[in-house]
Amino acid sequence: MKSFIARALLVLVLASFSQFARGRIGADIPWTTYEAEEMTTTGIVLGPKYGPFLVETESSGQKCVKLRAPGEYVEFTVQSSANAMVVRYSLPDAATGGGIDSALAVYQNGKLLKELSLTSRYTWLYGKYPFSNKPQEGKPRNFYDECRLKDLSLLKGDVIRLEKNDARAPYCIIDLIDLEQATPALAAPANSLSLAEFGANGRGEMDDTEALRKCIAAASKQGKAVWIPAGVYKLTGDIDLPARASIRGAGMWHSTFVGAPELYGQADRRVRFKLNGSNIRLEDFAIVGGLNYRNDLEANDGILGNRCDNSVLSRLWIEHTKVGMWFYYSSGLMIEGCRFRNTVADGLNFCAGVRSSLVQNSTTRGTGDDCFAIWPAPPDQAFATLMPGSNVVRHCTGQLPFLANGGAIYGGADNRIEDCLFTDISPGAGILLSTTFPTSSEQLKVDNNFSGTTVVRNCELRHCGGFDHGWEWRAAMQFCLDRKSIS
């Protein structure tokens, strides 16, 4: 225990004081956030409130604005030019669960710009972990969703109004609005095969699963990349990626893979990219699933990697899947510039057998479990010799999960969380070092408990620490010796 205490103090000193000497903390954020409670409004400002099962607590800064009657609005002045918008909002659930639909009108300088379609289909979970969609079980969480709007032309000084113009929902709550100057759509890279050549049209109306599979097979055979032109592409099954496969899109705002809502209840019909070999590259596209419940017996959708050494995943936007990314038995991974939004579980998890891997300059918001996790779970027998460790979470920003923590390390050797920003972590700790989850196997004589030196350095925690469903109250930064000592 003495060893644990000494090391814990070292970590806390580094976290508390080194930020003043080491420069930037968190990810590079290309958007400007406008908080609803700071806007001009005819609605009601809610909060701050601090406690479980409250929409205010799940809000940025624990404040938000509630629009009730048609005609009520929030309004703000644009600080810098932008062509893309994200609105974080909350609608009520249907009386029996399943969500409702509504709309908001967006005005620019008094002129109707766009009507946003909103839904609560992917929010509202209830009861005990892993939660349900049944309102009668009480204890609600996961109040918020987001919608994206692009191809705008907003100038500094423009006045933007979001107005409730729809009576289908008794209210609409606005938490925040992000404005961003999204980069133009990228051109096709040299030495690539276009998905369009295999029958996909980019309108999101047809099933593009087989077209993508054929394009990947042909590109791999020819040693070329797969090119995803700007557009929307529907996927209804697994996309298996062999070694050295490369998929490149026109940008996370431009090339989007979506799931089929009517099929998303079937675990094998979801949007799932499976990395099954080394040196794979995924770049510049978005994945938008359709998951609205958690079942840990079902395979994760999003991106899964197994034995995918030295793979690079850059500038991906992943939303409405169970996890953003989950990796096993891999080394030398590089994840950079990614956004994980509104997942049902983790944003990113370096799980069993992951070593010498890095996630950097990436962000999460609205995840249903840890924003960024390092969990060296017990290995399968075939991988018992792979020792996890030396993984790094660096220059990342985690915000507003509805369960669990910002950055979490559950064991392993010499793992690090550095230069990170965690804000509004109301259901858990900003940073958690814990032995709660299993990391050892007596049968395989493997023990992946904490070893070497675990480092948390130059991190900033804002509005962190709160009610955890299993542990009641968490600290802003917590050491949890649940099943084993840390020594």
Where are the language model's segments positioned?
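Structural detector of coil-to-beta-strand junctions
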Residues: A225, R270-R272, Y293-R294, N300-G302, ...
